[in-house]
């Protein structure tokens, strides 16, 4: 995946599945292979079922849970853990955001191709997600 690219996949991929997991991979320039202090906003299509709250332990950013998770309509905003130490290496990398089934997301009730949007700082991403008939 090139810098600025994104992929997303729901598990299961079946229409109406709830709870469903969602994995979003974002490719961008990273400082020391970490997302940095900027919040990660993941915007789900209106057909997706999103709870009013999501527990931070129900979400992973790479290998750790975010420090905070907030929900506003269909946008879930994640605050990554603050990096520790000093590092100046900037290189292309991939951040993997995973909403486990414990996040209680629900797939759209109709099969089709949907677009998940994400942003980190000034960088915007979009990725298609295919939902199959039940």
Located regions from the model:
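Ser/Thr/Pro/Gly-rich, low-complexity intrinsically disordered stalk/linker tracts of secreted
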Residues: 1-134
């Amino acid at each position: 995946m090139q810098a600025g690219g994104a992929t997303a996949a729901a598990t299961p991929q079946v229409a109406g599945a709830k709870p469903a997991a969602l994995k979003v991979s974002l490719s961008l320039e990273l400082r020391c292979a970490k997302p940095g202090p900027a919040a990660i906003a993941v915007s789900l299509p209106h057909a997706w079922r999103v709870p009013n709250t999501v527990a931070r332990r129900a979400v992973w950013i790479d290998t750790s849970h975010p420090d905070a998770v907030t929900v506003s309509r269909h946008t879930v905003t994640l605050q990554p853990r603050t990096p520790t130490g000093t590092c100046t290496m900037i290189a292309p990398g991939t951040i993997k955001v995973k909403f486990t089934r414990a996040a209680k997301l629900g797939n759209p009730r109709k099969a089709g191709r949907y677009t998940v949007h994400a942003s980190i700082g000034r960088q915007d991403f979009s990725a298609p997600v295919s939902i199959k008939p039940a």
